[in-house]
């Protein structure tokens, strides 16, 4: 089934608060997908989330917190017609909660406990607009990675298997199920959150594609990119003629230090930038980058040479 964009209209638009007007839903059929459909789904999500007027060095940027709509819904359709809908903040793609069809005709919503105030009300009314069929089953922990890892019972996300089949299986363990453990829910959430991470990073999208028909564990580069998205976004935004304001120390797939000096070194891995205020360059002269290329090679050589000597 082709990834589709569904615009929520009619009565919803009248009753919903201003902040959630015209919330859009991206639909992804996890149960019968292909690499091509997965790529289309992520493109749809990025296009829905990005600010069409903001780019740095050709990389789209997410909007600020004042932009409407404030949220994006992602409906995941699993095998056996089971579904779960994720609610994301548009300005950073953080997962705020999710809903699932429950007890034949009810909508059950689940919200992280670090979502509060107006946002919490928005999640409830956006995921389950009909108050007469709304059922609450809150997530009794916050959305931070360390908390989710603790609930799953692992020391690191590197121990959690990812993949399309894993996501499909996890949907079946949650959607419409009366009772499930915090461990089961946290396992689902850790995998589902990778949708946001893949939307942010082409590198993570490509990891999923490479391992499309099997489960896989995230490598050190995946984990590092997830933890430094804000820092990477700011560095690219503040770059002058493609040169970062200061060396950016990251980690490659093997776990070795990766020193980034130029936008074009990291650009192939990045699909969306976190919002950074102020203007930035949209293009740069590639021919002017040769000295920085030499310097970058030197930085990485020296950084990893130092690590090599530390082992003795």
UniProtKB/Swiss-Prot annotation:
- Show the disulfide pairing: 56-280, 107-128
- State the active site: 197
Q: Which GO terms describe its biological process?
A: defense response; negative regulation of translation
GO MF annotation list:
hydrolase activity; rRNA N-glycosylase activity; toxin activity
- Which reaction does this enzyme catalyse, per its entry? Endohydrolysis of the N-glycosidic bond at one specific adenosine on the 28S rRNA
Q: Short name of one Pfam family for this protein?
A: RIP
| PANTHER family reported in the protein's UniProt record | PTHR33453, RIBOSOME-INACTIVATING PROTEIN
- In its keyword annotation, does this UniProt entry include Hydrolase? yes
Q: Which Gene3D superfamilies does the UniProt entry name for this protein?
A: Ricin (A subunit), domain 1, Ricin (A Subunit), domain 2
Official protein name in the record: Heterotepalin-4
Query: What EC number(s) are associated with this protein in UniProt?
Result: 3.2.2.22
Q: Where is the signal peptide?
A: 1-22
Asked if Cell inner membrane is a keyword of the record, the answer is no
């Amino acid at each position: 089934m082709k990834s589709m964009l569904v615009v929520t209209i009619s009565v919803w638009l009248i009753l919903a608060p201003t902040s959630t007007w015209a919330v859009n839903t991206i639909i992804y059929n996890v149960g019968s997908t292909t690499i091509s459909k997965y790529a289309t789904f992520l493109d749809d999500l990025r296009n829905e989330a990005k600010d069409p007027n903001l780019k740095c060095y050709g990389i789209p940027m997410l909007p600020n917190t004042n932009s409407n709509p404030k949220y994006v819904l992602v409906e995941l359709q699993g095998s056996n017609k089971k579904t779960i809908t994720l609610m994301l903040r548009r300005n950073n793609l953080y997962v705020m909660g999710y809903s699932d069809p429950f007890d034949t005709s009810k909508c059950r919503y689940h919200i992280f406990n670090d979502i509060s105030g107006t946002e919490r009300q928005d999640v409830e009314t956006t995921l389950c607009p009909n108050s007469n069929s709304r059922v609450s089953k809150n997530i009794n922990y916050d959305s931070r990675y360390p908390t989710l890892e603790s609930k799953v019972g692992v020391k690191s996300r590197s121990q959690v298997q990812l993949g399309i089949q894993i996501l499909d299986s996890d949907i079946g363990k949650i959607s419409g199920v009366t009772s499930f453990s915090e461990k089961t829910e946290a396992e689902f959430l850790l995998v589902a959150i990778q949708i946001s991470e893949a939307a942010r990073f082409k590198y993570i999208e490509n990891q999923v594609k490479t391992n499309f028909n099997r489960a896989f564990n995230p490598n050190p580069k995946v984990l590092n990119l997830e933890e430094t998205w804000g820092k990477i976004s700011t560095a690219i935004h503040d770059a002058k003629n493609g040169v970062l304001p200061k060396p950016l120390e990251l980690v490659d797939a093997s776990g070795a230090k990766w020193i980034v000096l130029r936008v074009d070194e990291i650009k192939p891995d990045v699909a969306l930038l976190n919002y950074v205020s102020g203007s930035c360059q949209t293009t740069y002269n590639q021919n002017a980058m040769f000295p920085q290329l030499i310097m970058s090679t030197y930085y990485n050589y020296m950084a990893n040479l130092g690590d090599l000597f530390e082992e003795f």
